Structures are given as structure tokens and as C-alpha cells.
């Protein structure tokens, strides 16, 4: 896609064509092929590069809904691209790289691959938030998202380095084996592991815009282009919830007594702030931002249960959240086109 865009968008012989819509449909076709491969899963459960990435039923389930939600977000953005005269094909390239980061994040089974996948996703989202260059609100949203996102990435990296320092490994599987039985010991390794886990949890909660790390979300959603706000609200949250579940329910499940009530508190806080914060809003995009904060709280409460039934509830809620959010944002975009309003408030 990148070569196609670079070569043909600068071709004078072809009249310098605008390739955003064409590139978008090509990428939708690629996503459909990826969806078919994921559903068929010809390889089956497996690990890649010494357990750096894994493929299992949980991973396939999450990937299917990431791809479906991504297709919807790309298709509904075509009219917005035409109305706003966005002629840069890089819009689709950035979306494709961020989706690739989310798919890799879902398969991550190592602290290094987890961090690299999050950064691949985040760096593209920073640019997409500020993609509407003529809007000061979009530029502000991109800058704010970049600064606070860099802070959360630093917190996440610090937590990962602590866990590596106290365990000597970055593999989720090896860390899970080492954490078994540590809860009965009062030694330095146990305390260091808890501190590292706390920093990692804070970094991921920051990315998900869960309480108390939700401050950036309404401002970024309001300033970003509307299709990008829809993308922020749906797709990254699915991948991050999957990562959060894998870390806390699989890797550190033996330490549930140490993190369960903290996650439960964040869950209750997100539900309360999402519900009552939305009542104060007069702009629809800020209201939807608070709505997404509340939905993150509902998903976190399933993780805080620490059981298989709780995880099943989270997966069911992901499906409902994806359908509801897609319908809501699509309706919002269609209303803006009918009223000929370039920027939805």
C-alpha cells in the first residue's frame, strides 16, 4: 500500500490522483482476507519466535472482532474523507499500521513484544489524532495525546524493566511459573514483582482511559476527526482489554489477592465517572468519550472476578460494546453529513 501510494500519488502522467479511497478499499480487502485466515486458522494453536508471539483460541477470538471493527471504521470514514477533502493516502497507511500493532498486541506473550506492539499502535494513533491539520482542535488533541501517551509508555516500560530485573525473564510463561508460590513469601522478589505489576497495570489503564487515568480521553475524542474518534473508542480498547486479561488472569493469576481489589476499585470508579461525567456534557463527542470510560469499567469488573466465567462475560461484553459503539458513531457521522457540518461538536 505504501509503495502504491508513493508511486502513483506523485505520478504526473496519471494526473496526480487522489488515492485515499482506493487505498482504503484495497486495505479493506486485505482485512477481509486476514479475517478468513483467522477464522480458518490453518496452523492451529502455536507459538512463534520462542513464545514471543502465540496463537490460541483466545487470540483468534479477539483478532476477529478487531478486524471486523476496523473494517467498519474504515468504511464509514470514506464519506468524511470526501467531505473534508483529505487527499493524503497516509491516512490509510497509519490506520493499517495501528491495526497491525493491535493484532500483534493480542498475540504478545513477552514483555518486549508487548511494548513494541503498544508503541506501534500508539505512534500511529498520535498522528491520526492530529491528522486534520487545518483544525486547531485536532492539533491540540494530537499533542495532548502524544504527551500523555508518552508518559503512560514510560510507566509501562518502567514496570516491565522492574519485572525483568526481579525475574530475569521477559516471557509471560516463565514469569507465571516464577510467580507461583511467591505470594506465600515476604521476600524482596515478591515486593518487586508487585511494584512492577502495578506500573504495568497503570500504563495499560492509562491507554484504556480507565479511572483514575481517564483525563485525556474527552479532550482527545473531541478534537480528533470524528472517524478517528470512533476508531479510538472501539478498536484499541478491544486489544488492550485482551492484553490486560492475559497479564492479570493468566500470567499473574496467583497474585490475585494483591491486585483484585485495586482493579475492582478502578472498575467502580470508571463506571461512576463515565455515568455522572456524561451528564455534565453538552458536546456529543465528549459524552461518548465518557460513555467509553464507563464501558471500560464494566469490562474491568469481569477481569477483577479472576474466574473463567468473568472472562467469558468480558468477551461477550466486547461483542456488545463493538456493535453498540459502531452503530452510535455511524449514526453520528451520518447526521453530520446530512447537516453539512464539517465538525461534530
Question: Where are the regions that the model predicts?
Answer:
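Alpha-helical transmembrane segments of multi-pass membrane proteins predominantly involved
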Residues: 1-345
Amino acid at each position: 500500500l505504501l509503495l502504491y501510494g508513493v508511486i502513483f500519488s506523485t505520478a504526473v502522467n496519471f494526473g496526480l490522483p487522489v488515492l485515499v479511497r482506493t487505498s482504503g478499499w484495497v486495505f479493506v480487502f486485505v482485512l477481509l482476507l486476514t479475517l478468513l485466515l483467522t477464522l480458518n486458522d490453518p496452523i492451529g494453536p502455536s507459538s512463534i519466535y520462542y513464545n514471543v508471539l502465540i496463537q490460541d483460541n483466545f487470540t483468534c477470538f479477539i483478532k476477529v472482532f478487531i478486524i471486523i471493527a476496523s473494517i467498519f471504521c474504515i468504511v464509514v470514514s470514506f464519506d468524511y474523507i470526501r467531505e473534508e477533502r483529505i487527499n493524503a493516502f497516509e491516512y490509510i497507511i497509519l490506520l493499517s499500521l495501528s491495526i497491525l500493532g493491535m493484532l500483534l498486541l493480542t498475540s504478545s506473550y513477552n514483555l518486549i513484544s508487548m511494548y513494541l506492539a503498544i508503541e506501534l499502535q500508539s505512534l500511529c494513533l498520535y498522528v491520526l489524532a492530529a491528522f486534520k491539520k487545518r483544525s486547531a482542535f485536532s492539533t491540540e488533541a494530537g499533542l495532548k495525546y502524544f504527551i500523555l501517551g508518552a508518559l503512560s509508555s514510560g510507566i509501562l516500560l518502567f514496570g516491565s524493566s522492574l519485572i525483568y530485573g526481579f525475574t530475569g525473564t521477559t516471557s509471560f510463561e516463565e514469569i507465571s511459573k516464577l510467580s507461583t508460590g511467591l505470594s506465600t513469601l515476604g521476600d524482596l522478589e515478591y515486593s518487586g514483582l508487585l511494584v512492577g505489576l502495578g506500573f504495568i497495570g497503570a500504563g495499560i489503564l492509562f491507554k484504556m482511559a480507565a479511572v483514575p487515568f481517564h483525563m485525556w480521553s474527552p479532550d482527545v475524542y473531541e478534537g480528533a476527526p470524528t472517524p478517528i474518534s470512533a476508531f479510538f473508542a472501539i478498536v484499541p480498547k478491544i486489544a488492550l482489554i485482551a492484553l490486560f486479561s492475559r497479564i492479570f488472569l493468566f500470567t499473574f493469576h496467583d497474585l490475585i489477592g494483591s491486585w483484585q481489589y485495586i482493579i475492582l476499585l478502578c472498575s467502580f470508579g470508571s463506571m461512576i465517572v463515565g455515568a455522572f461525567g456524561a451528564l455534565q456534557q453538552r458536546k456529543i463527542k465528549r459524552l461518548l468519550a465518557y460513555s467509553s470510560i464507563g464501558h471500560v469499567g464494566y469490562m474491568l469488573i469481569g477481569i477483577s472476578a479472576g474466574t473463567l466465567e468473568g472472562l467469558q462475560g468480558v468477551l461477550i461484553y466486547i461483542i456488545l460494546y463493538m456493535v453498540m459503539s459502531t452503530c452510535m458513531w455511524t449514526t453520528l457521522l451520518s447526521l453530520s453529513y446530512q447537516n453539512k457540518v464539517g465538525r461534530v461538536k
